[in-house]
């Protein structure tokens, strides 16, 4: 059994919280790293986790913007584009909105916060943080 901090929700041995205060992607990632050891913007690894996060956003983001930041952004190196999670996990599960895989990624409101879509990294959006729970 494991515990999350007060105000955080547990799923599959990780703790999650949705935050209403709009931040840029970098500001949100920095905020998440300050909340807990190994904290980052949320990574999503399965349909079940996507459902959990979508429900968390629906229940906790008071005035949802078009996007809610997740921990995925494009890294551009020598004309090669690759997406990676902020927590440096490799991408195994993907759920892009059709044709979208550039800039910073957010959960799109018009998909019920289930599909990923791009947004300008400097846009200010609500966000979800995630960290591994302590045993």
From Swiss-Prot:
It is found in: Secreted. The keyword Secreted applies. It holds the Pfam family Lectin_C. SUPFAM superfamilies: C-type lectin-like. The keyword Endoplasmic reticulum does not apply. Keywords: Disulfide bond, Hemostasis impairing toxin, Platelet aggregation inhibiting toxin, Secreted, Toxin. GO terms for molecular function: toxin activity. Residues 11-130 form the C-type lectin domain. Expressed by the venom gland. Its main location: secreted. Disulfide bonds join 4-15, 32-129, 104-121. GO terms for cellular component: extracellular region. Potent inhibitor of collagen-induced platelet aggregation. It acts by binding to the integrin alpha2A domain and blocks collagen binding to integrin alpha-2/beta-1 (ITGA2/ITGB1). The gamma/delta subunits mainly contribute to this activity. Heterotetramer of subunit alpha, beta, gamma and delta; only the gamma and the delta subunits are disulfide-linked. Alpha-beta heterodimer and gamma-delta heterodimer associate orthogonally, giving a cruciform conformation. This heterotetramer may covalently dimerizes thanks to the gamma subunit. Belongs to the snaclec family. PANTHER family: MANNOSE, PHOSPHOLIPASE, LECTIN RECEPTOR RELATED. This is Snaclec rhodocetin subunit gamma. It comes from Calloselasma rhodostoma.
């Amino acid at each position: 059994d494991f515990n999350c901090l007060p105000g955080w929700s547990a799923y599959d041995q990780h703790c999650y919280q949705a935050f209403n205060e709009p931040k840029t992607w970098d500001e949100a990632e920095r905020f998440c790293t300050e909340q807990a050891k190994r904290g980052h913007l949320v990574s999503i690894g399965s349909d079940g986790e996507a459902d959990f996060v979508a429900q968390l956003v629906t229940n906790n983001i008071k005035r949802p913007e078009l996007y809610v930041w997740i921990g995925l952004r494009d890294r551009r190196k020598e004309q090669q584009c690759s997406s990676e999670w902020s927590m440096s996990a490799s991408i195994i599960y993907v759920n892009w909105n059709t044709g979208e895989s550039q800039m910073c990624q957010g959960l799109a409101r018009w998909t019920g916060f289930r599909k990923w879509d791009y947004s300008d990294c400097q846009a200010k959006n609500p966000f979800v943080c995630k960290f591994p729970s302590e045993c």
